[in-house]
Structure formats: C-alpha cells, structure tokens
Amino acid sequence: MSSSDKIPSLFGDDDALAPVPAAPFKASVEPRVEPTPRPIPPPPPSKTASAPGEYSAADIEVLEGLEPVRKRPGMYIGGTDERALHHLFAEVLDNSMDEAVAGFAKTIEVKLDADGFLSVKDDGRGMPVDPHPKYPGKSALEVIMTVLHAGGKFTGKAYETSGGLHGVGASVVNALSERVEVTVWRDGFEHLQVFSRGKPLGPIQQVAPSKKKGTMVRFKPDDEIFGEGTNFKPARLYRMARSKAYLFRGVQIKWSCDPSRIHDQTPPEATFHFPNGLADFLAERTKGLTTITPESFAGRIERQGEAGAVEWAVTWTPQGFGEHDGFMQSYCNTVPTPEGGTHESGFRAALTRGLKAYAELKGEKRGTIITADDVVAQAGALISVFIKNPEFQGQTKEKLSTSEAQRFVEASLRDPFDLWLSSSPKNAQALLEFVIERAEERLKRRKDKEVSRASATRKLRLPGKLADCAGSAVDGAELFIVEGDSAGGSAKQARDRKYQAILPLRGKILNVASASGEKFTANKELSDLMLALGAQAGAKYREEDLRYERIIIMTDADVDGAHIASLLITFFYRTMPELIRGGHLFLALPPLYRLAHGGKSEYARDDAHKEELLATVFKGKKPEIGRFKGLGEMMASQLKETTMDPKKRTLARVTLPRHEESVEDLVETLMGRKPELRFRFIQENAEFASADLDL
C-alpha cells in the first residue's frame, strides 16, 4: 500500500482532532501595498444586477473581513456537520496546547455550560492586547480574532513548534460563532472583548486589576451555520481533551460539563494528566488484550537545536484490535495526521531495519522476507513528533511531508529499539517469530491468489476492450476505468503492464440510482465492468472473487469528468457497497494545468492550485500555462508521471461514513428519479448560483 493510499485514523472519534488552521498570540500581518496604476476613465458603473446571460461589474461580489468564512465554511473546517462543529473546539484547544508545549502553560480547563457555551482556559502568557502597529485603533487581540492569517506562529519567535498558523483558526472560530467572549489576564489586568459572527461588539475593555496570566475563549457556534439544534457532544469533547493530555505529558487538562448536557456515561468532571504520555495512551487502548511482549516499546527523544522531539509507543497483539488487525496513530505538534506522512515512514523503517538486523545477528535466515507491512500488520502504534516549521501535503494538513522528519525519527529510534531487543532476548525472539509468521502468511496468500486469479481468468470471458495486466497476483493489481478510447489509448501506453489494467468505457454511463433493473442488466458498459472485476453484485459479492486490489476511476479533471466519476461511484455504492467498505475504490487526481518556465514545469490539479504555484514556484515569472482538455490530450509520459505512477501520484480513497443513512439520502437526492429534490438541494446549497441550471 502506497503512502497516498493510507487508510484514515483507526482511533474512533478521537480523529475528530483532524487539523484545520488554528490561533495566535502575536499578530504580524503586513497589509499588501499595490502599485498605483495610471488613471483610466472607468465606464459607467452598473447599479443593479445584470440581466440573465449578461456579466458585468454588478455580478462581482467582494467578500470582506470574515465574510468568506461564513459564505464557505467548508473551505476552512471541512463542512458544517458534527465533525466540523467539533473542529472549532480543536482550534481553540490547539492554541492553549501550543502555550503548554512552549513551556508557558501547565493547566488547561475545558468547560461545557448548560446554555451550550464552550470555554477553553489556560494559564499561559495571555494573548497580546496592546495596539497593533499595522492596524491603527485595533488591539492585537482584535486583529487575531478578526483577520485571517494573523498570528504569532509565522516567524518562530513566539513559538518554536506549533500545531499550525493559529491566526486562521481563532478568526474562523469567531466567524462561525454566534458569540465569542475572549478574556485575557495580562500586564496586571483582566481584559475582555466580545464578538458576534466575526465582528467585535465593542472595543477591548480593561475589566479589573489582576495578577493572573492566561486566556479564556468562551464561544457558542452559530445555528445559522450549523443548523438549529446542533450542539457539542460531551462524549466527543471528553475524548478530544483526553487525547491532547496523552500527547503532552507536561500538561494537566481539567474537564467539566453541566449534567443537563450529558445523556450517556461521560463523567461530568475529570482531570487528565498522563506522566508517561503515549505509553499510558497505548496501555489504555490495549487494556484486556494479550500482547506478544509483556512490555511495549515506548520512549521519548529530544534533540537540541533544530531537530525537535519524538515520542512513541508500540506493541503487538495476535488477536488484533477490534475490526482492524492493527493501527498507527500519528501526530505532529499535537495535531493528528490521519493520512500519515514522513514521520510514520521513519518509524516503520526504524522498526523494520532493527528487527531484520536482530534476525541476522541471531542467524535467522527467514528474516530477509520481512517487510515493513509485516512488522506493523498487527501492531498498535502511536507516534508524536515536535518539529519546527512542519510542512503538510494539501490544505487539510492531514499528512506530514517534511523530509527531515523521516530521517529524524528513524535515527532517533534506531538505538533505543536495538537496546530494547537486546535487553530481553526471550521477548525479542517471540516478536521475531510472530513477524516472520505474518510474512510467511503474506507470501502464502499471494501464491494462493496468483493461482486463484489465473484460474478465474481462464474461466471468465473477459471483455475484449479490457487491456488486462500481465501479472497473476491480485495484490498490487490495479484496474483503471477510463472514459473513451482516446484516454484509454494514452493510459495503455502509460501503464505498468505487469500490474495495471485499463478498461475504457464508451458513451454515457448509466445512472443506476434512477434506472430500472432491466436497463441495468442490459447495459453493456456496466456488464463489461462487472466481468472485468470478476465479482458479482449485491448479496452475491465475494471479495475473494475480486481480480484487482485497487479499482481506480480515472476521468478528466473537469465538470464532465466529475459527472462520470459520480455516476461510477453511484454504481459501486448501489451494487457493490462491500467493495467500497473493503477499501478497494479510488479516484485518480489528474492535473488540469501544466505550468512551464525555462526548464521547470509543474502541474496544477485545479484553479486554486494553479494560483498557488503562480504565487510561489513561479512568483515574479510569466510561465506558459496549458490547460488539458482531457486525459487523451496528455502525452503518455505526462499521464504516467502525474496520475498513474504509484511513486508520484495521489489517489483519493472512496470511503463510507459510520452513519450510512446520510449517504443513501444524498445519493437519492442528487442521483435519484425526483428532479424536485435536486432543485431544492441546489437552492439550499448553491448560494452564488444565479445562472440557469440544467437539472
């Protein structure tokens, strides 16, 4: 499994801590100064919205301040559902955690009141309240709470390690809250400022003298954004607070909740403090389970200077962890990285090399067959790194891409793991035998699948347009579903013939959500797809019949391509939901643009990515920009480099949420037989849609 195909967090609802930008303590925002252009007489301004079909200045909407956040909350917190709601808490909590990690706070208090207000209080330095030099008449606190990208985490002077650029998070929480009350104890006084829906209700006030230090943010999410009756879940808040305490052993987090808000077994009061950090976390997670070694491999290394710190805990169990054989939960600067990244790669490499070296030392020749997947297959692992200036892949910050993190983690764990193995030969031998057994089982499964796949291929009447892969193993085999012969031709040239098969589909894909059973049965394209997969639909689906490990939908990076992908996902959801639950369905992410200047070229997946490249990689330059009209336009080498090469591509795994009823409702609304449901959905969700829509 490639790093880009990683399964999301397996730690239950604790993955609600998934990161989005977070909140500051020193504002440093440089207003952009544009050069003064030569005056050009403007045309008469439009005073009213233009007529249908026309496009004028009246159609241009300028969103100022925090209005973009309220208009498009999904861009900042990933939606407006329960998970997104709890992101607000994660943002505020991350700010206080950064104060603790920096050594300025020891205690954090989390409180959910009867009126639905949630407060997070710390005993850190307190947000700065002095006037901001770049914003006359505004305090630094007001800038922090009302200006996107204002924060004290850019220069590294206020924080060496932080969970993100928290000026984004504080202002986003403010924008999406009905009311926010920020109390700061600093400079000998208690200060208070109140906000509503992103706007201050008045200037900052000096309430009373006080010797205390710290910050308290008390807020209530806005029903206009999240819907009536959407409230914080005490159980989820409790788990999130407890997880943060595990991640930094130097902090104490106090939890309290009004009893009227609790409808389960969540304690109304609790104090979280874990002196052993992740080792305590793992002990709680593995309570009652039989482990291969009596003690887990756990530790913490701090490196002076630029490197940072790493903490880890790992154990192995023969029975697995509930629905999963194993899990790996990772964090960077206390923020979850559910998609993994370089710190996980270093962790896996250190364990694998250490165990193989131990096998060689003991003369165990079977140790050569061990892979990293064998080592972590039935392991419960936790890893947390603290590094300066972390780099993440994508805007969601769920995958760490800092290359130094891999080297740092691997180097830090190498000697401690060797020492742990050598200090208890009996336990080390038990672990080695256990991992070798996993490796031998893996090789046996591969051999059985090769025989099974070869036998199934001989029995099946595969569609003639399928360009099948040459290999007989199911593991690693991939089926790319592409649109039309043109794209299919490019894909066939770009593929790895041993592992990658290509199935071009012609014509419009049938919408199975609105089609009758007879139409579905008679549809040749979908029949060919079923034949290629080898598995049957509905209750007759058997995963062992599936001829490929990954089914990858590869369509053009435009609206038409997205429509075809939606139809195919609907097909799999309605006819083979177990294929999705098994983690076999993926979306390829081909680029939409190619930017080139001199000898350098970059690919952009969408307009936002293109603008980002223009502002960074090609800043001050005028690159040649080409737009791909379709996959068939791309050279085979380009398609391979950007979309099909497992070492370079990015895949999006299609998953189903825990509560699948919402998915069924959405599929029926958008893809079903009732156009009035689609029309109502568009009316409620497409705020800027003013043009005629083809329903």
From Swiss-Prot:
Protein EC: 5.6.2.2
One Gene Ontology biological process: chromosome segregation
Cofactor(s) listed in the protein's UniProt record: Mg(2+); Mn(2+); Ca(2+)
Record's catalysed reaction(s): ATP-dependent breakage, passage and rejoining of double-stranded DNA
UniProt keyword terms in alphabetical order: ATP-binding, DNA-binding, Isomerase, Magnesium, Metal-binding, Nucleotide-binding, Topoisomerase
Family of the protein in this entry: Belongs to the type II topoisomerase family. ParE type 1 subfamily.
Protein name: DNA topoisomerase 4 subunit B
The species this protein was found in: Caulobacter vibrioides (strain ATCC 19089 / CIP 103742 / CB 15) (Caulobacter crescentus)
